Regions:
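Generic protein-terminus/edge-of-domain signal
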Residues: 1-105
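A hydrophobic/aromatic-rich effector-binding and dimerization subdomain
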Residues: 2-21, 53-57, 61-68, 73-74, ...
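N-terminal regulatory/effector-sensing and dimerization cores
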Residues: 68, 74-166
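Short, Lys/Arg-enriched, Trp-marked, Pro/Gly-tolerant hinge/linker segments that flank
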Residues: 183-186, 204-214, 223-251, 255, ...
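Short helix-capping/hinge SLiMs at alpha-helix to coil transitions
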Residues: 255-257, 306
Length: 347
């Protein structure tokens, strides 16, 4: 789909947006608004999942992956235009969100912080962070929702970098103390603009293998940000230190998963073992052994997907002396044997 057709579709108001525009216009007249609320078609509200703040049963505080993603784990990205005029309702979710102002402007609130966003601005939001987006006119804002598991499976190389973007995602994947948001001001960068238009076009058409191309375009967006905008990033500084500590520990365990011990990790960071154990529990909600097991199994998943190494060799490479113990542990946490996991990912 060419850029003109994509932009025409994005600029055309859909049924939900027409409702929300009428809702906003009605609010200018108290008497007119009361009449508007009384004549709302409840079937339309149900069918379109419309948000009507005056009807509490239409408001959700939490959104789950199952509401946006199919059970097919290969499709881990959902792309849509944020509906214009939607009432800005605070909410959170258990996946990552990225939104990009393609044209126009919007206002975004995260906890107590409000940002005015304009064309070219891009914002990453962590899971579990309460926020609200207000597109009060016919601006075009693109929403990209990304499963947490998608980062481990498809953006593994991005996570290996020592940069702010990688650390942002790592801090949530391995810690309960992540950075709430990152904002990039990219202005009229034509490469990013084209990438988001292409992303929307692919997702609208859903041709064969579209999910592969969607993953590739999102990777391209990440790379463009890494190349040009790491020094012009806005983030909550008060959360930076704790998140960096969590990331350093996670990276240490990724690199040394096969041989890591609590004592060795504590010595690396100049902690006592007791303090290191408490710190890991506070940051991740897991014990050292639980976190180490998580990292070892993620390393094993990557080797099963991307190499032809025998299962026994993978077990040894990630830190298991016994292949049988590795297979039992893998099956307990992943729900499949290592061979079954490899077969499923290559199907």
């Amino acid at each position: 789909m060419d850029e003109t057709r994509v932009m025409d579709q994005l600029r055309t108001l859909n049924e939900s947006e027409l409702f929300y525009r009428a809702y906003r216009l009605a609010k200018f007249s108290p008497s007119g608004f009361e009449a508007f609320i009384h004549q709302i078609d409840r079937e339309q509200v149900r069918r379109l999942n419309l948000l009507v703040p005056e009807w509490p049963d239409t408001i959700q505080a939490e959104y789950l992956e199952s509401q946006f993603f199919s059970p097919d784990r290969r499709v881990g990205i959902h792309v849509s235009k944020h509906n214009c005029y939607t009432p800005p309702v605070p909410h959170h979710h258990n996946f990552f969100e990225l939104f990009y102002v393609l044209e126009g402007r919007c206002s975004h609130q995260i906890r107590e912080h409000t940002s005015a966003m304009s064309a070219g601005d891009l914002c990453f939001i962590q899971p579990r962070v309460t926020h609200a987006l207000d597109v009060s006119d016919e601006s075009v804002v693109i929403d990209v929702l990304i499963r947490k598991s998608t980062f481990r499976h498809y953006f593994y190389s991005i996570l290996q970098g020592d940069n702010l973007l990688a650390n942002f995602f790592m801090s949530t994947l391995y810690s309960e103390r992540g950075i709430d948001y990152l904002i990039f001001h990219t202005g009229d960068d034509p490469a990013l603009h084209r990438a988001f238009v292409e992303l929307c076009g692919e997702y609208m058409e859903k041709q064969d293998y579209y999910s592969v191309l969607v993953n590739a375009i999102v990777t391209k967006i990440f790379v463009l940000l890494l190349r040009k905008y790491m020094d012009a990033c806005e983030l909550p500084q008060d959360q930076f230190h704790d998140s960096q500590t969590a990331v350093r520990i996670a990276r240490y365990l990724q690199t040394n998963a096969a041989t890591a011990t609590l004592g060795g990790m504590a010595a690396e960071f100049h902690y006592t073992p007791e303090y290191a154990s408490r710190l890991i529990k506070q940051m991740t909600g897991q014990t050292f052994i639980q976190l180490l097991t998580t990292v070892r199994l993620e390393n094993a998943e990557q080797l099963l997907r991307d190499t032809a190494m025998p299962v026994a060799d993978i077990a040894a490479a990630v830190g298991y002396e016994s292949s049988e113990h590795f297979i039992r542990t893998f099956r307990k946490h992943v729900g499949l044997t290592p061979s079954g996991y490899r077969q499923k990912k290559r199907a």
